[in-house]
Amino acid sequence: MWFQLSSLRSILNVSTALRQAVVRTPWYAKRKSYKVLFWREITPLAIPIFLENTCVLLMGVLSTFLVSWLGKEAMAGVGLADSFNMVIMAFFAAIDLGTTVVVAFSLGKRDRRRARAAARQSLVIMTLFAVVLAVVIHYFGSEIINIVAGEATPEVKGLALTYLELTVLSYPAAAIALIGSGALRGAGNTKIPLMINGGMNILNIIISSILIYGAFSWQGLGFAGAGLGLTISRYIGAVAIIWVLMIGFNPALRIPLKSYLKPLNFGIIWEVMGIGIPASIESVLFNGGKLLTQMFVAGMGTNVIADNFIAFSVAALINLPGNALGSASTIITGKRLGTGQIGQAERQLRHVFWMSTIVLTAIAWGTAPFAGLFASFYTQEQDVKEVVKVLLWLNAAFMPIWAAAWVLPSGFKGARDVRFAMWVSMLGMWGCRVVAGYTLGIVLGMGVVGVWLGMFLDWAVRGALFYWRLVSGRWLWRYPRVKRE
């Protein structure tokens, strides 16, 4: 009895101490304002973005699942081609970010004309660029796959080339969908991009299923149907984006078709590119480094390529809430600074950062015990599943530093602080991930686990530097210094 009372007293003392510690934090005094921020600003932005990203990734997982029935060589081919496609999509997404920030900032200042001009001209410039890029990549497709695939088997290289040549045709449509969705998000409308991108990805699954496996008496196209289905669905999504902008679902961004023929305003283009170009350099160099580490993995055999691809697919699902909160922080920061609310922008970014850290860590630690189950959706090969489990447990162990590495720079970009992120990204990727990944994975023979440890070192360096940038306040260098409220 005495022991039970003593234990109860100890528990109460710990509980009281924890409560007092929470009460003394700056967060507690402002908890009501943070509650308003969460429900009125973060939730309306982040939840549709989260659902949109979830839909995109789940459709990607289902697409991979469809291809996986054709064999691990087909899955490896898609993984290799997509590792290059992701570099291009990252470039488009960086310009999309520039459009989002300029639109959000312009509407914060109630300048609708400038917001529409930024969206329209970004669409024109990036569509033309995507057409040229698609032609060049299609012409040099074999050389690109030979570089990316490294020592992969000829069969895997052939499948990767087929997939690349089909998906490269979708680049103009992907540019339109990304830029248009970014402009709508900058205007605070996240539901329409959710509906369009969600519908586009559902169509991708339906069309790809029919094209791969056939319907009724038609036998289908086999592996080629996967790339063709993706391309067709992206063009449907691009048409939907143009239509939404044309009829003015969001009055602030009504862009008639004939307005695309107007002369370009290079002042606005440079404003968008001033954010988009450093962000695109960051994305291309970062994803180029990822591509190089993919080449390390490609030389380890088909099974290891599948291990890496499956683990990345599952990890991407775990990171979805953080990506959504990062996108929301870009929009919130841009709008706050557009109205001159510098102190609010700083407080709200800190709140989003800590929220992301807690949520992602809880999800990663909660899902790690089920890593083998997730791997079973992709493959039944036991050796592949064992490696995937190791990678996902490592991912969970390092998840507490993920938000500092990825959510904070998203908020900084809303303040147009893009060059610092570019340099940090280059340092983290090329100074840590590539060097450490090669040393651990290839030189020391740790395989794909060593490559992933190099990635976690990149997270740590990025997180430390971005957190220092937040605490120092230097990310607000474009705005007058104010006394913190």
Model feature map: region roles:
Residues I49, N53, T64-F65, D82, ...:
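Transmembrane alpha-helix boundary and packing residues in multipass membrane permease domains
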Residues P44-S63, L166, S233-G237, I241, ...:
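Transmembrane helical elements of multi-pass membrane transporters/channels
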